[in-house]
Amino acid sequence: MYRKPPSGPVHGRTFTQEARRAQIVEATIETLAEIGHTKTSFTAICRHANLSSTGLISYHFAGKPQLLREVTRTIVEKAGSLRTSRVAQEATYRGKLVAYIAAHFDFMARYPAHARALTEIAELVREQPVPELDDVARSALSVEALVALLEEGCRAGEFRIADPPVLALAVQGALDNVVRHHELFAMADLDHLARELTDIFTRCTLSP
């Protein structure tokens, strides 16, 4: 689903400071999911987290871009961890591809606010350049892990794919659009959609 982005600095922070940063990040995720990126401000996040002052956020994050960078890193890391765990359990490359796709839907089901927040950040980056988010945005959009899986499957003789990077982009594009469509139309049967997409893309791996 995603490549793990660069981690932010953690040296020199106390346990209490780390806990407060985590609280702010989670509150930002929930705020983004509820009211969108255009309305998400330090004031709105304070209300959501019951913080007494926006200064508490400013103490840990220099500005909104820095905070959104940490939010993106947190979401991408969580999604990547879930995907890696699911894929690692499979012995075949077909099984790994199925697990890769299933992990995307599993993440949406387990962490709907995180999925929505990441979509909001992606929309923000599309609307206006945010230099502080460049590297984490690239990480969120990366298909490197999926390309590697498909190429390894080809080398193992399980897949016959003419251009793994193109298929990886098709898979990821479909998965990303599912998130946006689900948010707009609240599709109830995600399990059915997961099965259909899995069937479509596993068939593609058998094409000469």
Q: Language model features by range: what are they?
A:
Residues 1-19:
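N-terminal intrinsically disordered/low-complexity leader segments
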Residues 1-7, 106, 140, 144-155, ...:
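C-terminal peripheral helix-coil segments that are non-catalytic and often amphipathic
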Residues 12-13, 69-99:
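Amphipathic alpha-helical linker/stalk segments
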Residues 20-29, 45, 67, 71-79, ...:
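Generic hydrophobic, amphipathic alpha-helix propensity
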Residues 23, 35-66, 70:
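Helix-turn-helix
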Residues 24, 28-32, 104, 201:
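Short hydrophobic clusters on alpha-helical segments that form packing/core surfaces
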Residues 77-85, 110, 119, 128-156, ...:
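Amphipathic alpha-helical packing segments from all-alpha helical-bundle domains
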Residues 84-114, 167-171:
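Hydrophobic alpha-helical connector segments
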